[in-house]
Design a protein with these regions (language model features):
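Generic alpha-helical transmembrane segments of integral inner-membrane proteins
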Residues: 35, 39, 69-77, 95, ...
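Juxtamembrane helix-boundary/capping and inter-helix hinge elements in multi-pass membrane proteins
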Residues: 9-15, 22-29, 156-166, 171, ...
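Membrane-interface loop-to-helix entry segments
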Residues: 53-56, 64-114, 128, 169-173, ...
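Helix-loop-helix junctions that connect adjacent transmembrane segments
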Residues: 63-66, 91-215, 341-344
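TM-loop-TM module centered on a large, flexible mid-protein loop between adjacent transmembrane helices
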Residues: 18-21, 26, 54-58, 170-233, ...
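Residue-level signature of transmembrane alpha-helical entry/exit and packing/kink sites
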Residues: 30, 64-68, 72, 129-137, ...
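C-terminal membrane-solvent junction of multi-pass transporters and transport-like membrane proteins
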Residues: 89, 128, 252-264, 298-345
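Hydrophobic transmembrane alpha-helices that form the core helical bundles
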Residues: 1-72, 77-80, 94, 221-242, ...
Length: 345
């Protein structure tokens, strides 16, 4: 919700960096925040490419490195192709992805009856080990919600962003939350936890448990993770463009190809770092790093909104209560602190 209001107040590329500059007038903070957003996008894309390799294993066991290279090369080509073409591709794959999640819920629909009869099963035991496990799981699961905030980073390529951006963010959050809740119920009641633990293609395992070929959902999941990686590559390159346009990054990142109207240099740099991360780190480590950096960014973004509400008297088209960004900042700090302590144990 904080992103929705900030997108209405300050519709610019490199949104988070622009928010920090407008709120606190601190170029160093803006620069750090902008580069942190680029890092989140790049690490997140690397996580998704690893996920692609996992779902591809349902069809064939192929060497990971060549698959990753071809995958990143293809995504980079689409991102360079043009913003209109890239987003049209992303929208089409998003529709396919949503259809896949609905398919999982339908084929494992008996899980909802089990949930109605035994809803207490979804609750953890109230002991220290279980609670710590749930919080740690929530930290990693937070990664699933990363992406909605990327909408603000293409603000300058959106018509009437003051109204369109908040609406898009709210709709994205509501739809994704609803689907994730349904999938969580299905995953809890459809198959034993040990079946899903460590499974590289968990949704395929759920579908297979109901007598359907796992290849159906694995095929859809392949496109889903590619779509997520594509969006992150586009976002990271646009943030680099915004930073360079504001003098906060090398000018080369602000160069736009006259034919494709895309920042080719920035896109290539993001893709190169993405390949390096895929080679160096496993999926779970990438997801943890992404969540940690994203929570730090969200903390600052919530503080930016609180500061702007204090400084600016004009209400934007979309406005949230002050308590919302305050609660968001406190919750993000609490999750960072807990996971940091847990990591050091």
């Amino acid at each position: 919700m904080s992103f929705a209001e900030l997108g209405s107040r300050i519709p610019r590329s490199a949104g988070e960096a622009a928010y920090a500059q407008e709120a606190f007038g601190a170029p160093l903070l803006s620069t750090m925040l902008g580069w942190a957003v680029v890092a989140v996008g790049t690490v997140s894309a690397a996580t998704m490419v690893h996920g692609f390799v996992g779902y591809l294993s349902v069809f064939a066991e192929l060497p990971a490195i060549p698959v990753i290279f071809l995958c990143v090369a293809g995504l980079t080509a689409i991102a360079i192709w043009g913003i209109g073409e890239s987003l049209l591709t992303a929208a089409a794959i998003t529709a396919l992805e949503a259809a896949g999640l609905v398919f999982v819920c339908v084929v494992a629909g008996d899980s909802f009856a089990s949930f109605a009869d035994d809803w207490m099963r979804i609750l953890p035991d109230f002991n220290q080990t279980a609670i710590f496990g749930v919080v740690s799981g929530a930290f990693i699961a937070f990664y699933a919600f990363i992406g909605f905030e990327d909408i603000v980073n293409i603000a300058e390529e959106v018509k009437t962003p003051e109204k369109t951006l908040p609406r898009a963010i709210v709709i994205a959050l509501l739809v994704s939350t609803g689907l994730y809740v349904l999938i969580a119920i299905v995953a809890t009641y459809a198959v034993p936890p040990e079946t899903l633990a460590g499974n590289p293609a968990p949704l395929a395992a759920i579908v297979e448990s109901r007598g359907f070929p796992p290849g159906i959902i694995a095929f859809i999941s392949l496109f889903a993770v590619l779509n997520g990686a594509l969006v992150q590559i586009i976002m990271a390159s646009r943030v680099l463009y915004g930073l360079a346009s504001g003098g906060l990054a090398p000018a080369a990142f602000a160069r736009v190809n006259p034919r494709t109207q895309t920042p080719i240099f920035g896109t290539m740099i993001v893709a190169s770092v993405l390949l390096l991360l895929c080679w160096l780190l496993p999926l779970l480590s990438l997801a943890r790093i992404t969540s940690f950096i994203a929570l730090a960014i969200f903390t600052v973004v919530n503080l930016c909104l609180l500061q702007l509400k204090r400084k600016q008297t004009v209400r934007p088209d979309f406005c949230v209560p002050r308590a919302l960004p305050l609660a968001g900042a406190v919750l993000c700090v609490a999750m960072i602190a807990y996971e940091s302590i847990n990591f050091l144990r």
